């Protein structure tokens, strides 16, 4: 009897092991822990856009056609006037035409200069700038940006930009033919602007009361962050104001505040799973869905509709000695064709792989799938939010 009992015990152990493996296989995967700096940001710690208008000179005959872009000529005249160089407003014959208007320059171009002022930037720090053509310049390659003030939204000058441009494209033209690789009307100057004014430190003005803003609104993630912060720094350190904003009580001293923020940003939190969502790009026909999308059983019938318009010229020749004229007319033929669309069963999908397999079984194009997904959503078969961008 002992061998029989041992065999039964081994069989029971094997069944228990198999049950555990099946439970692990079908159990939902645990959310991966992420650093807090990847989930949220401190309110007030952000970049500030800067913009300016200037001139690029030194172009090899590829600048603005100044007769067609009067603002380029006007800007050049103002710049020369600031340098103490005056341009005669009358012609040599005493006519009324302006010398500024008659200037035909090919080596200068009007440009817009943009930059991003990082948080806590100090005077003397160098930042990168992007230079983009404003007129009809063919290329900015080899040009030099003249001194350009960069202003913020408040109208104050925060940086000064100047330097030689780096353009990633290349091109050549001759006898009406032209070859171009990449973009020639924009370039970049690494470290081309010097910060002249700093933005007031918003964090220092909060007196130790900071607000943490989640990148994506989620009440569950906000609650998990509050629990993680309070467990690490003590109860009452973090309080959730809503699904996106968390209020923090930080040290008022700047040195202690830096240590607090460094430790805070490295906390690991497991965020809640994102809501099921399908993104439809109406311009490119792209469809993107996350792993939470599921399908219910449904039947789909979709037939392609095609319209063909064929236009051919028809020559009407008059009879002999009729004093008529030969006339060319256009004759159009329109054909409307619709393919037969039979009902196809779309099986339910509990995960992303099954959803993709079910949609691929329809054999529809991305443009057709956009209409099918919208119809599935209306019928209640698609368990996800549709967003068209």
Swiss-Prot record:
Its main location: periplasm. GO terms for molecular function: structural molecule activity. One of its GO terms (cellular component) is outer membrane-bounded periplasmic space. It is found in: Periplasm; Bacterial flagellum basal body. The keyword Signal applies. Keywords: Bacterial flagellum, Periplasm, Signal. Residues 1-33 form the signal peptide. InterPro entries: Flag_FlgI. GO terms for biological process: bacterial-type flagellum-dependent cell motility. It comes from the Bacteria. The keyword Signal applies. The basal body constitutes a major portion of the flagellar organelle and consists of four rings (L,P,S, and M) mounted on a central rod. Belongs to the FlgI family. Assembles around the rod to form the L-ring and probably protects the motor/basal body from shearing forces during rotation. This is Flagellar P-ring protein. It comes from Burkholderia mallei (strain ATCC 23344). The lineage of its organism: Bacteria, Pseudomonadati, Pseudomonadota, Betaproteobacteria, Burkholderiales.
